[in-house]
């Protein structure tokens, strides 16, 4: 029995595989099971045109058998089998369509095996990652002869006649001995093998059978147990996404959510997709109630389970979800994707991009549906993931705002709950020009801000923005339904004031005093002026430029900040008793005037939650006033 040499590129591949340090060696079982499933598929397709072949699905299966004593693992199928010529031609992906890609990779001097295995997959040859010797015994449908293919690796292979009663293929692996770095015994452990099947091949359409060791009480003594062997089908076969959604209950989806370990919570909703057309795929997606513990950390990996025809390609495919929907969990299955498609190829895959676009639109539609029909659930969701949606608007220069802006919720001055932008717009007065908002650390603090007095007294609703990202997202949006956003701290609120004439008169009358205050505070504010917005409070800070005071606080808190400063105006309530004291000091006592100016500025800072530059000086000034 002559040994034949492998082709040069196949020999190089085998050398890489055999000596590979690739950590994910368990995928060999996925590859061999997929080959077995394909073999049964071929027999099924043949039965469609061959009347003499009666295909009964119950007769077709894949069997995994362990022989620990001889360190053998056997994967058998009842598929179409292979002739001698097919054994010569068809063993391994690289021997066929993969050879050109392999040559390209070889030219790039890929050395460690990770790229080869990850990029191209290695099909049958992956068996050599865990086996020192591989034997294939196969009998083709319609043939009276069976053949044995044997190889110990790069030295070559042999093909010889053998005996086999039934049509199909047995792949027998002689598992390697353990090393200091690798535990190969695990591939002879039935429970470990079962877990690998569940992970990668749970939804193969044919039964995957194993003889499993179990125990039961002895007949004569229930306190003692005896072991027995029972054949068990270890895969689910028909995944939930292949079933008719009209036949499934909410409990079916919840059970699947738990079985796949998507979370300890319950999903607030699910999405079952069966898309046909330019790209065909099926998916079951879940929107969880709460984020996982590591969701807002670098350790979190977004992505959906990606299957090709029931076989897991990638445990988490990040390209299926935009970052702002990274909370979505679930599975996608498409027959249009290659089993061995790599991460690099997926990123360029047009079909995958079409799937991702479809998923994005479905998730958006479902979130909007929950928002409109189950507000309580949506608010629970928004409490967990609303921040992510806002970052989605702010990032990428606002290009996602059309997708996300109608999903936002904010606290409101008129409602003791969160409101949407649509709800705000629907309640606007006829003469209202803007969507008004105020920023702060909490609803309670914002509600007491002096800047909100004037707008609320006009009867207008104010949105309360309590998160760091809120105003950045609002600035990126600019407007909603052609209505511009306006901070209550802006210079021009677009509102008529009964005190406007008084303020203008006082502004002119006391221009010298305001200019002097601005000079004293020249390194802190851009201007000092009479306020049109203040009612009960003596003083406040207002925004002069694009960067607001709240944005300044956020930017200042970041590492490597560039000391970004908001342009500020100090506004004085000319109708407050304090104003009379201020003018009196301006006219009579320069030192007291400087003291009052400093106190009023620091008071305004405290209201805004800004730090006081010199707390000791401030407390001393307060003591001077009191003494």
Swiss-Prot record:
GO terms for cellular component: cytoplasm. One of its GO terms (molecular function) is ATP-dependent protein folding chaperone. Residues 554-627 are annotated as: C. PROSITE patterns: HSP90. It is found in: Cytoplasm. The keyword Cytoplasm applies. The keyword Oxidoreductase does not apply. Residues 1-343 are annotated as: A. Gene3D superfamilies: 3.30.230.80, 3.40.50.11260, Heat shock protein 90, C-terminal domain, Histidine kinase-like ATPase, C-terminal domain. CDD domains: HATPase_Hsp90-like (cd16927). InterPro entries: HATPase_C_sf, Heat_shock_protein_90_CS, HSP90_C, Hsp90_fam, Hsp90_N, Ribosomal_Su5_D2-typ_SF. Residues 344-553 are annotated as: B. Its main location: cytoplasm. Keywords: ATP-binding, Chaperone, Cytoplasm, Nucleotide-binding, Stress response. Molecular chaperone. Has ATPase activity. Belongs to the heat shock protein 90 family. PANTHER family: HEAT SHOCK PROTEIN 90 FAMILY MEMBER (PTHR11528). Homodimer. This is Chaperone protein HtpG. It comes from Natranaerobius thermophilus (strain ATCC BAA-1301 / DSM 18059 / JW/NM-WN-LF).
């Amino acid at each position: 029995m002559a040994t034949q040499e492998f082709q040069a590129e196949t020999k190089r591949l085998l050398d890489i595989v055999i000596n590979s340090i690739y950590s994910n060696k368990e995928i060999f079982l996925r590859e061999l099971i997929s080959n077995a499933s394909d073999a049964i598929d071929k027999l099924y397709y043949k039965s469609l045109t061959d009347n003499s072949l009666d295909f009964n699905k119950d007769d077709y299966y894949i069997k995994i058998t362990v022989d620990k004593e001889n360190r053998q693992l056997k994967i058998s199928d009842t598929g179409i089998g292979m002739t001698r010529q097919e054994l010569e031609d068809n063993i391994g992906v690289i021997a066929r369509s993969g050879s050109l890609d392999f040559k390209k990779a070889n030219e790039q001097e890929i050395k460690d095996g990770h790229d080869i295995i990850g990029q191209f997959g290695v099909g049958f040859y992956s068996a050599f990652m865990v086996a020192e010797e591989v034997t294939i015994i196969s009998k083709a449908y319609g043939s009276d002869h069976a053949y044995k293919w044997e190889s110990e690796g790069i030295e070559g292979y042999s093909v010889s006649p053998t005996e086999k009663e039934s049509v199909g293929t047995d792949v027998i692996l002689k598992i390697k001995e353990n090393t200091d770095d690798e535990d190969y015994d695990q591939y002879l452990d039935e429970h470990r093998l079962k877990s690998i099947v569940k992970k990668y091949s749970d939804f193969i359409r044919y039964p995957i059978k194993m003889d499993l060791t179990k125990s039961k009480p002895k007949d004569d003594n229930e306190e003692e147990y005896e072991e027995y062997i029972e054949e068990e089908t270890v895969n689910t076969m028909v995944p939930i996404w292949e079933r008719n959604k009209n036949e499934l209950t909410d409990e079916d989806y919840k059970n699947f959510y738990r079985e796949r370990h998507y979370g300890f919570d319950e999903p607030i909703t699910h999405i079952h997709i069966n898309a046909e057309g330019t790209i065909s795929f099926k998916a079951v997606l879940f929107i969880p109630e709460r984020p996982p513990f590591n969701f807002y950390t670098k350790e979190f990996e977004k992505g959906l389970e990606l299957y090709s025809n029931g076989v897991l390609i990638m445990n988490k495919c990040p390209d299926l979800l935009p970052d702002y929907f990274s909370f979505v969990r679930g599975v996608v299955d498409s027959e249009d994707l290659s089993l061995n498609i790599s991460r690099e190829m997926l990123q360029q895959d047009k079909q995958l991009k079409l799937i991702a676009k479809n998923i994005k639109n479905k998730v958006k539609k479902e979130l909007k549906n929950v928002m409109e029909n189950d507000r309580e659930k949506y608010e629970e969701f928004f409490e967990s993931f609303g921040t992510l949606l806002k970052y989605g608007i702010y990032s990428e220069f606002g290009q996602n705002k059309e997708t996300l802006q109608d999903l936002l919720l904010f606290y409101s001055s008129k409602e003791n709950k969160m409101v949407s932008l649509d709800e705000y717009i629907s309640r606007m007065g006829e003469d209202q020009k803007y969507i008004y908002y105020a920023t702060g650390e909490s609803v309670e603090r914002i509600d007491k801000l002096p800047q909100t007095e004037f707008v609320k007294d006009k009867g207008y609703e104010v949105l309360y923005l309590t998160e760091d990202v809120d105003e950045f997202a609002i600035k990126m949006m600019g407007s909603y339904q052609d209505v511009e956003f306006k901070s209550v701290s802006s210079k021009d609120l677009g509102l008529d004031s009964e005190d406007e004439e008084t303020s203008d008169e006082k502004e002119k009358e006391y221009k010298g005093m305001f200019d002097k205050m601005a000079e004293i505070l020249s390194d802190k504010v851009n201007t000092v002026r009479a306020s049109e917005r203040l009612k009960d409070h003596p003083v406040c800070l207002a925004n002069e430029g694009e960067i607001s005071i709240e944005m300044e606080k956020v930017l200042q808190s970041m590492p490597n900040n560039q000391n970004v400063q908001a342009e500020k105006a100090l506004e004085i309530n000319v109708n407050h008793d304090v104003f009379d004291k201020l003018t009196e000091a301006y006219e009579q006592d320069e030192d007291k005037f400087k003291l009052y100016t400093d106190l009023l500025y620091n008071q305004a800072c405290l209201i805004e939650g800004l730090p006081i530059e010199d707390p000791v000086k401030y407390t001393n000034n307060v003591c001077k006033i009191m003494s």
